[in-house]
Swiss-Prot record:
SUPFAM superfamilies with a match to the protein in the record: Prokaryotic type KH domain (KH-domain type II), Ribosomal protein S3 C-terminal domain
Transmembrane helix listed as a keyword: no
Name of the gene encoding the protein in the UniProt record: rps3
Keywords, sorted A to Z: Ribonucleoprotein, Ribosomal protein, RNA-binding, rRNA-binding
Function: Binds the lower part of the 30S subunit head.
Disulfide bonds: none
Pfam families given in the database record: KH_2, Ribosomal_S3_C
Name by which UniProt lists this protein: Small ribosomal subunit protein uS3
PROSITE patterns noted in UniProt: KH_TYPE_2 (PS50823), RIBOSOMAL_S3 (PS00548)
Signal sequence residues: none
Keyword Nucleotide-binding annotated: no
BP term (GO), one: translation
Subunit structure: Part of the 30S ribosomal subunit.
MF (Gene Ontology): rRNA binding; structural constituent of ribosome
Amino acid sequence: MVLVKKYFLQRSMTKVMVDEYLAKQFYNAEYAGVEIVKTPIGTRVIIYAGRPALIIGKGGKTIKQLAQMLERYFGLDNPQITVTSVENPELNARVMAFRLAIALEKGYHFRRAAFITIRRIMNAGALGAEVIISGKLTSERAKYEKLKEGVVYKSGAFLDKIVDRAVAIAMLKPGVYGVEILITKPMKSVDKIELREQPKGPGENMVTVTNVSFIEESQKSGEQK
């Protein structure tokens, strides 16, 4: 039993180490995540990115070097690497965090870049988005700026399935800027309330609301007469 636990623990640690390495190595490629699947003939590695061409490289040179690196330093047996694009990058917190960090490094104003990021996320259909940028934004003293739109859940059941969270860093002359993005996915949540449409037929399942005070005044005037 101990060996089984050790095996799964070691496999999880390897995935985390590979994920951190790929995030640093392919920062500009808008790296989104990785899946590692053990097969009878080797190890299948699926890399998700917003710009897959930067990971593949010219003539597949970069991906061949990456396969050698994964086998030598991370112990992956005969890695077969597949690079695929993210289906909806605007709803992937990691992709948007890297995009925002790259924009800050290019010289965009932090508030303008954050507004553009939130607008793109909401236009993609997200229920909510939150962007937090921290660092020496306007002075020598570090502070943070938070922008939020829509509904962003911070606790509750199935939080990891409803909200996508990612962090990134941007290296600037004043220092290091931290970027954190939270995206509420476009899915039905537990606290969502839907109102039924008004029935087409007249008088069908309809409730008429009458002004009660008007009825009481009419009754009093009738009694006085």
